[in-house]
Structure formats: C-alpha cells, structure tokens
C-alpha cells in the first residue's frame, strides 16, 4: 500500500538538509543514515548515501532510476547463505 498522494513523499528532514547544503557547496561525500524509509528525491542524484542494514552501513550511489524509491530497498537486511549441503557427514548421522 502506497502513501496517500495528498500527503506527498517522506524524507527525513536532517538528511534532506544535508543533501541541499552539499549541493549548494558542490561537495560530494558519503552521508550515513539510519532512515531507510526516506524517499529518494531528485536532489540526491549523484550522491553516495550509506544506508544502515541493521549491522553496517551499505554505501549506495544514487542514480536517476532510483528517484521515487525508498533508501531501504537498496540495502538488504537479510543474507541467504543457502540450505545445508548434502555431505557424507550429514547423511552418516542418520
């Protein structure tokens, strides 16, 4: 379910302020954020934002195709390492 159109997209105020300040100064540095729920705005294109995945910050370079999506979509929180392998040791225990 999406957000109501009358409310508009959400972006963390501090994160958006940092982006706007960096655009005015012409700086490009990594910004750490825990706000996975923030929507990517056109002002963010070209910046690298490190999004927290619950364990570490995953650096994400923002491109035009990402505008309108959430930051959390690009930093997965779960890592699937595969099911157990069928080895001699595991079958011998039965």
UniProtKB/Swiss-Prot annotation:
Gene Ontology MF: a single term: structural constituent of ribosome
Single biological process term from Gene Ontology: ribosomal small subunit assembly
Pfam family, one: Ribosomal_S19
Annotated GO CC locations: cytoplasm; small ribosomal subunit
UniProt superkingdom: Bacteria
UniProtKB keywords: Ribonucleoprotein, Ribosomal protein, RNA-binding, rRNA-binding
InterPro entries, per the entry: Ribosomal_uS19, Ribosomal_uS19_bac-type, Ribosomal_uS19_CS, Ribosomal_uS19_SF
Family: Belongs to the universal ribosomal protein uS19 family.
Function comment: Protein S19 forms a complex with S13 that binds strongly to the 16S ribosomal RNA.
Record protein name field: Small ribosomal subunit protein uS19
